[in-house]
């Protein structure tokens, strides 16, 4: 039986070396202590959580020793699991923040934090009314850890563009180049039509905005091996050609006509340097206020106070 699968000529973009370079740019990054030390929120919360865990550890050791079954003072065995679970939870959050991969694992982090919060609150309920100093100290450690856990759930469960999280991140020294610390990699991938990662760690396709990025569509051809239908050629009226089709008015390729209205205002939460290969992008500094014409999509048409117009990445801006 004759095969109908002829040889196909695929677009060269499938084997584009620039795409391979872009993929390598987004591989797992190493640990950078500057992400912890330079971020007051991360430094404070991880330090308090570690201190609370140490209190829980020593309180559990002495509390287990001081239990008295005759007085109905029994140490809850599940508290040991909660102790170990929170140890790995704090350690995991430390590495996630240090490697600047919170946007990749934020969903898993929130789930694990919820489990840890349930264990901590259950331990508090069983230890705080015991009347034994060591058990009450353990309960105090769990209370402190639960407070940090609730703050973490709110932080990691919020989008980077949320007002409270953007305000917290504005104090970080490294977040300006790190939130989208993929800024340098994003510029590399701009040539391939890939935008910055969104809040869920995925990448969105965006059209090329520069004239150099306008290329004719790739044609995918194949051998039909007798399946073609030549009758369709005879159905085309004689004298009909593409010249009879009205053509749209010619314009400058790659040129974006700026809108006349800018009803929105947005504040830059991070500085952004425009791609020098894309004339439609604009640069702006941190805390600069821009006028926005449309808030749909990943790239917004913006106008600066100087009158300069262009497109700006939405994850660097927050609406006012």
From Swiss-Prot:
Residues 62-77, 125-136 are extracellular. The chain crosses the membrane at residues 41-61, 78-98, 104-124, 137-157. Pfam families: SH3_1. Residues 187-258 are annotated as: Disordered. It is a multi-pass membrane protein. It is found in: Cell membrane. Residues 261-320 form the SH3 domain. One of its GO terms (cellular component) is plasma membrane. Residues 1-40, 99-103, 158-320 are cytoplasmic. InterPro entries: SH3-like_dom_sf, SH3_domain, Sho1_SH3. Keywords: Cell membrane, Membrane, SH3 domain, Stress response, Transmembrane, Transmembrane helix. Residues 187-245 have a biased composition (Polar residues). Its main location: membrane. Plasma membrane osmosensor that activates the high osmolarity glycerol (HOG) MAPK signaling pathway in response to high osmolarity. Belongs to the SHO1 family. Forms homooligomers. This is High osmolarity signaling protein SHO1. It comes from Sordaria macrospora (strain ATCC MYA-333 / DSM 997 / K(L3346) / K-hell). The lineage of its organism: Eukaryota, Fungi, Dikarya, Ascomycota, Pezizomycotina.
């Amino acid at each position: 039986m004759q095969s109908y699968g002829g040889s196909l000529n695929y677009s060269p973009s499938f084997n584009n070396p620039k795409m391979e370079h872009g993929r390598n740019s987004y591989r797992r990054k190493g640990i950078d202590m500057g992400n912890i030390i330079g971020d007051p929120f991360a430094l404070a919360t991880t330090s308090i959580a570690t201190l609370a865990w140490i209190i829980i550890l020593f309180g559990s050791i002495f509390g287990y020793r001081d239990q008295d079954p005759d007085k109905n003072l029994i140490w809850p065995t599940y508290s040991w699991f909660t102790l170990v679970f929170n140890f790995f939870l704090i350690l995991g959050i430390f590495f996630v923040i240090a490697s600047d991969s919170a946007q990749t694992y934020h969903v898993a982090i929130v789930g694990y934090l919820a489990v840890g919060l349930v264990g901590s609150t259950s331990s508090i309920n069983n230890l705080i009314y015991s009347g034994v100093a060591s058990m009450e100290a353990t309960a105090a450690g769990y209370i402190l850890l639960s407070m940090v856990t609730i703050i973490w759930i709110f932080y990691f469960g919020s989008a980077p563009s949320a007002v409270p999280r953007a305000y917290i991140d504005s104090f970080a020294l490294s977040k300006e180049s790190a939130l989208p610390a993929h800024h340098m990699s994003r510029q590399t991938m701009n040539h391939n039509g890939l935008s910055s990662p969104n809040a869920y760690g995925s990448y969105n396709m965006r059209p090329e905005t520069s004239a150099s990025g306008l290329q004719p569509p790739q044609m995918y051809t194949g051998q039909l091996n007798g399946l073609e239908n030549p009758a369709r050629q005879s159905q085309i009226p004689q004298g009909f050609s593409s010249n009879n089709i009205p053509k749209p008015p010619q314009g400058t390729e790659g040129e974006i006509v700026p809108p006349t209205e800018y009803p929105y205002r947005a504040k830059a939460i991070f500085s952004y340097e425009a791609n020098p290969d894309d004339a439609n992008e604009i640069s702006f500094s941190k805390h600069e206020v821009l006028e926005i014409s449309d808030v749909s999509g990943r790239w917004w048409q913006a106008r600066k106070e100087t009158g300069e117009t262009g497109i700006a990445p939405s994850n660097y801006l927050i609406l006012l």
